[in-house]
């Protein structure tokens, strides 16, 4: 299917029964690119904001979990994890209408805070799942040595722990970024049709008859989602280029 999208995006004419397009052209990309600037910017901004909020909440959750474990205080986090996973288990359409009604009552429908919040509902579980193993496997002895050498727990957290966990954090954010990009129904319901994202535009174009334009929109959506993963790969390699162990 990916190969078909790539061929359609550069096809000038492709008629039955030809196996490949008879003519190729890049004109399919020239016109839609101007129309894609707003959907791309809206999608990227909403995804970045929801990912940043998600990573802050998830890191705070794990830190609280570890603090309770060190203090040997009984935690209900394991028993309440199902709350985080609910958006993954329940069909979106079954509770999005309720969220929309609440936002309408409080006059928040079609606003940026509402859009970011509803994306956060779906981004948070994926960020939590992808970061859980790496964060819980972190060797606390690094932090103990850091507190001995360079100062208090807050300074050690930012200068040692977060740096050592930078790559898994970036990858979990990349997953969340891709999840946010893919949201269609939440954007349509909560955004009240006021936010044109790359996904809503792609679905709208897909209902038309021009497969060439549809392929351009679909590939653009794919490339935007891949940007997050490329950043998660390239950024640690560039920042820690003199520290080979930090790149793995």
Question: Each predicted region: which residue ranges?
Answer:
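Glycine-rich helix-loop "coupling/hinge" segments at transmembrane-helix boundaries
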Residues: 17-22, 184-212, 244-248
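Membrane-helix interface/capping residues of multi-pass secondary transporters
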Residues: 112, 142, 151-153, 184, ...
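Membrane-water interface segments at the C-terminal ends of transmembrane alpha-helices
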Residues: 1-15, 30-136, 164, 168-185, ...
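Residues in the helix-turn-helix
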Residues: 94, 155-156, 197
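Short helix-to-coil transition segments within interhelical loops
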Residues: 68-72, 138-166
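Luminal/periplasmic active-site loops of membrane-embedded glycosylation enzymes
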Residues: 20-32
